[in-house]
């Protein structure tokens, strides 16, 4: 016999995935659906073709080295196969592993940029640019500072990004001039070896290589150049490829392999709106930011951001640190989804640059002078537990009637300790006192749950252990009035 006051045609058990999209209604960090300190993994059944999306705890940080032996501002990191060493810049010093190479950079602040010549070049060197001077490092760690004293036609006050392209070193200036050295002569600059990006009236912000082309990225436009083999400047613009889409700041620009990502300024849609864009190889570029993220980007002092790209545990990720809002956003190129990363103290993720050697990712801290390893089998950040937080949308389950929850089941791998589960029935204003689910057992269950009209769920896990979750299930009944 039916229980009085309850609907009988409502599904008794409802499954809710624990992976999805951030749904922030504004710039507040704590409201709405959010996924913190996870990556998503997509699994496909080869027999049925069925797919399941799981939330997996992000990799953790462990200290690898501290080249300056104390707190210092991180400015760039690069692993060079030519010497088998990791090069870093902290404050105004260059380090080879932990050895200070004994020069003081001309520009004492801002991101530095790296390029390496080919093993078949006359001179195999690593080039570091701070936007004022270049620093050429040999495989024996002999360093030479290059500026207008060495060559009066050296492009002073350049943008910083330095490229190696077909035996040329290429740099650019904000007025749109793109300079190249003489072929296979990396200290010889002449005023004839210049071409300008001049289709639009905006200033140049950065250059980056995409396969066999150079992208000249202005603040509101992008032009493409290729090696046409002409004398002086060998580059020729591909007019039909130009885009009325700019680069909001070069600090957001990052690349790995044939993938390039950046925060774009988009005058074509009015108001200079900011979006995150991705170009992969020869494919057409695409916008990958969500409306929720774009609201945050448009409220940000974007020039203070940092960004990097690396592959970790099978995920090619773009990590965007927004200093003004104190938040770190991570885009997984493999599956096209965003998550958010935080530290144990609920602060911005500390890594401002990254590099990798033989599958091991290294991350440079923004302020403390340290270099960390980033590893999927490390479940802390430098010895401190950080919290995985999954907060769901505010569900009414398709009806305004009262709902009665009689059980909650969590589907995920067995692991260490407990996970906290709490609910909000007042649009995220308050959450009730968390109950715990034992993650060491197969049957992960909470009894009862009371009555609600709309409810959001929050799962928090702070153990020094792995975590992989797929979904949770609710047993609900609905009132009739």
Describe each model-derived feature in a short phrase:
Residues 98-100, 138-141, 184-185, 228-230, ...:
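Short loop/turn segments that connect beta-strands within beta-propeller blades
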Residues 75, 160, 205, 212-213, ...:
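Beta-propeller and closely related beta-sheet repeat lectin domains
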Residues 2-102, 106-125, 242-260, 265-481:
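Beta-sheet repeat architectures centered on beta-propellers
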């Amino acid at each position: 016999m039916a229980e009085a006051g309850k609907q009988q045609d409502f599904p008794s058990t409802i499954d809710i995935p624990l992976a999805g999209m951030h749904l922030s209604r504004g710039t507040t960090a704590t409201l709405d659906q959010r996924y913190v300190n996870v990556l998503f993994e997509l699994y496909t059944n080869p027999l049925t073709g069925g797919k399941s999306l799981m939330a997996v705890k992000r990799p953790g940080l462990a200290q690898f080295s501290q080249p300056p032996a104390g707190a210092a501002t991180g400015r760039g990191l690069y692993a060079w196969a030519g010497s088998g060493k990791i090069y870093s810049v902290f404050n105004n010093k260059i380090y080879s592993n932990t050895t200070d190479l004994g020069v003081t950079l001309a520009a004492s602040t801002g991101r530095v940029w790296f390029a390496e010549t080919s093993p078949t070049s006359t001179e195999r060197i690593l080039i570091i640019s701070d936007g004022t001077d270049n620093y050429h490092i040999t495989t024996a760690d002999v360093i030479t500072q290059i500026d207008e004293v060495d060559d009066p036609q050296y492009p002073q006050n350049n943008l910083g990004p330095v490229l190696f392209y077909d035996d040329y070193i290429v740099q650019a200036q904000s007025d749109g001039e793109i300079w190249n050295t003489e072929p296979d002569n990396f200290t010889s600059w002449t005023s004839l070896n210049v071409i300008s990006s001049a289709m639009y009236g905006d200033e140049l912000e950065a250059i980056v290589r995409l396969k066999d082309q150079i992208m000249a990225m202005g603040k509101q436009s992008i032009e493409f150049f290729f090696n046409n083999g002409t004398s002086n400047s060998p580059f020729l613009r591909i007019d039909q490829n130009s885009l009325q889409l700019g680069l909001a700041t070069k600090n957001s620009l990052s690349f790995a392999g044939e993938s390039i990502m950046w925060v774009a300024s988009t005058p074509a849609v009015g108001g200079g709106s900011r979006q995150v864009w991705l170009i992969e190889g020869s494919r057409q570029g695409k916008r990958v930011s969500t409306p929720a993220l774009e609201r945050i980007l448009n409220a940000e002092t974007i020039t203070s951001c940092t960004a990097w790209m690396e592959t970790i545990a099978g995920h090619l990720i773009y990590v965007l640190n927004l200093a003004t809002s104190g938040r770190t956003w991570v885009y997984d190129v493999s599956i096209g989804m965003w998550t958010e990363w935080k530290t144990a103290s609920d602060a911005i993720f500390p890594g401002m640059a990254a590099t990798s050697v033989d599958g091991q990712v290294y991350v440079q801290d923004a302020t403390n002078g340290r270099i960390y390893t980033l590893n999927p089998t490390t479940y802390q950040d430098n010895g401190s537990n950080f919290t995985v937080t999954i907060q769901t949308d505010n569900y009414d389950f398709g009806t305004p009637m009262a709902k009665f929850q009689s059980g909650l089941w969590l589907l995920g791998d067995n692991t260490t300790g407990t996970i906290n589960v709490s609910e909000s029935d007042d649009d995220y204003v308050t959450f009730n006192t968390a109950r715990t689910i034992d993650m060491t057992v197969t049957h992960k269950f909470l009894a009862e749950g009371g009555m609600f009209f709309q409810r959001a769920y929050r799962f928090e896990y702070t153990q020094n252990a792995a975590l992989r979750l797929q979904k949770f299930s609710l047993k609900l009944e609905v009132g009739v009035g």
